[in-house]
Amino acid sequence: MSFNHIKKVIVGMSGGVDSSVSAWLLQQQGYKVEGLFMKNWEDDDSTEQCASASDLSDTHSVCDNLGIYLHTINFSKEYWENVFQVFLQEYSVGRTPNPDILCNKEIKFKYFLEFALQDLDADLIATGHYVRRVDMNKKTYLIRGVDRNKDQSYFLYTLSYKQLKQCLFPVGTLNKFQVRNIAKKLNLITANKKDSTGICFIGKRKFKDFISKYIPIRPGVIIDINGNTIGAHQGVSFYTLGQRKGLKIGGVKQGNGQPWYVIDKDTSNNTLIAAQGRNHPRLMSIAFITEQTQWVKRDALTSPLHCTVKTRYRHPDIQCQIYPLLNNNLKVILKIPVLAITPGQSAVFYLKERCLGGGIITKIYHC
């Protein structure tokens, strides 16, 4: 009997194809597999929001097909307090947070992990993320998924070294086409199910309509870089740096006649600042500061390091030099200027395929 046969793994099941195939792959590797479906948002399930009744039904179908037991748990309270409230607080002060990263940090790899290990007596947990855990030379590394188009390491940079050693990512060595083919051969109900996109608690609703229920709309003015009023906005929280659409100032003709873009948000005066041209100097950054820096590797950074950084999901890696500051903060010097780096977003650092960690962007330096 192999070592894997005595290992119990709880798979986070979402009702999607990736977690479905993850469960089957682990079965093939000899693990004792059980599933767990998390409900993270209280809402009317008939409105097709995340954690809906249909997702749970699909998960039950997959588990029945694979012959594994399914646990269910409600983490809505934990999600509200540790993810959604933080999301609202950040937006209310003009920053643009990433709720998926918060959810992974606070729910999937904290409450789910603790519940699986302590209450369900599991040895490990697994998720359907497209990343790889590699054990080599008595060390464990978080590596990008083989499918670079689906790689999700950006969302998992908050994993601690200890947490990483308690996790498995079965589909990280496959591409999406292979995953769907496996699901089709197994006749899983999730085989052709579309990938979830966007912010889960918003679903198909318009972002502004949803957020305005929690953050009061405070109309204000849009000004140019000289302080001239050129339009009106519906609340600085609803705009992001580099945004072009929805400003309704296209008819304002100045300078070079190029389109207008949001280049800054003055939250204290409830003012939006816009300038013309996608490559305006106020939109281009050559350096920034990160706070709340977290490392997947065992030790924090103590000396400058040359690596690459990703400032948003699906954005290309940029060569950079990172310098440790006090309180585990970093200064990041970019090799080339980058467009619309946004406070509140995460900067994630890599050495080739290896994800080192990351932090929250708090201050940017323009060209």
UniProtKB/Swiss-Prot annotation:
Pfam family, one: tRNA_Me_trans_C
Entry's EC annotation: 2.8.1.13
Region feature Interaction with target base in tRNA, mapped onto this chain: 98-100
Segments of this protein annotated with the region Interaction with tRNA: 150-152, 312-313
Principal subcellular localization: cytoplasm
Reaction(s) this enzyme catalyzes, per UniProt: S-sulfanyl-L-cysteinyl-[protein] + uridine(34) in tRNA + AH2 + ATP = 2-thiouridine(34) in tRNA + L-cysteinyl-[protein] + A + AMP + diphosphate + H(+)
Positions bound to ATP: G12, M13, S14, G15, G16, V17, D18, S19, M38, G128
GO biological process entries: tRNA wobble position uridine thiolation
Active site: C103, C200
SS bond partners: C103-C200
An example Gene Ontology CC term for this record: cytoplasm
GO molecular function: ATP binding; tRNA binding; tRNA-uridine 2-sulfurtransferase activity
Domain of life: Bacteria
Record flagged with keyword Ribonucleoprotein: no
Compartments where located: Cytoplasm
InterPro entries per record: MnmA-like, MnmA-like_C, MnmA-like_central, MnmA-like_central_sf, Rossmann-like_a/b/a_fold
Keywords for this protein: ATP-binding, Cytoplasm, Disulfide bond, Nucleotide-binding, RNA-binding, Transferase, tRNA processing, tRNA-binding
Site description Interaction with tRNA, residues in chain: H129, Q345
Subunit (UniProt): Interacts with TusE.
Described purpose of this protein according to its UniProt entry: Catalyzes the 2-thiolation of uridine at the wobble position (U34) of tRNA(Lys), tRNA(Glu) and tRNA(Gln), leading to the formation of s(2)U34, the first step of tRNA-mnm(5)s(2)U34 synthesis. Sulfur is provided by IscS, via a sulfur-relay system. Binds ATP and its substrate tRNAs.
Sequence similarity: Belongs to the MnmA/TRMU family.
Protein name in the entry: tRNA-specific 2-thiouridylase MnmA
Species annotation: Blochmanniella pennsylvanica (strain BPEN)
Species lineage: Bacteria, Pseudomonadati, Pseudomonadota, Gammaproteobacteria, Enterobacterales
Protein encoded by which gene: mnmA
